[in-house]
Amino acid sequence: MTQLWLIRHGETEWSVEGKHTSHTDIPLTELGRQRAAELGKYLAGTTFLAVLRSPMQRARETCELAGFGDVAVVDEGLREWNYGVYEGRTSREIQAEIPGWGVWKDPIIGGETAEQVGVRADGVIARALAVAHGAAQEEREVSNVALFAHAHVLRILAARWIGLEARGGRLFALGTGNISVLGWEWETKVVLQWNRGIEK
């Protein structure tokens, strides 16, 4: 049985301000770093066959502070949604120019569509399952794979896991430094946990 552990990076200044952040490579805040270290304590009792992470600094810092820096492999598929001209802007700022604008329903000028991010997410899922399939030869009961990445790409990945279109990611809220787990109920792919704060 494969379980994918989705771990959103810790807090950044832009996440606090609600700015769309994809390719802008900014670090964690001090609180974000503290939460990332706490993640390490929370995850210490779980064995991961593989750890994949986004190449961005905020994901790398979270992964390293959680204690997985030495084993993590960069997966380009875990980059955040490319927001194009909307990078660094809040939804409120964009809506002042384009009333009713929403990232899930409107064109992303100079960036990616949700469907394109979905294709990347499908690739990540395939690679994670390939790792788990190899572990099945070792007769493991549960094969855990950790993914350190960003809100939108992880939300889309969750949607794709359960068979929704990429835009189905709009149904999943995901806070900074929080953990979600995807897995199986018999032969059906399911969400086992979602948006779990480690303080809970």
Residue spans for each PLM region:
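Acidic, low-complexity terminal tails and accessory targeting/binding regions
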Residues: 2, 81-92, 134-137, 141-143, ...
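Loop-to-helix element that buttresses phosphate recognition and phosphoryl-transfer chemistry
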Residues: 5-62, 109-122
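Short active-site segment of divalent metal-dependent hydrolases/proteases
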Residues: 12, 153-154
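Short, basic/glycine-rich phosphate-binding loops at helix/coil junctions
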Residues: 16-19, 95-108
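Phosphate-coordination/substrate-recognition cap region in phosphate-metabolizing enzymes
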Residues: 38-96
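Active-site catalytic microenvironments for nucleophilic, acid-base chemistry
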Residues: 42, 65, 69, 127, ...
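Short glycine-rich phosphate-binding loop at a beta-alpha junction
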Residues: 48-55, 135-148
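Internal catalytic-core helix/loop-beta-alpha segment
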Residues: 101-136
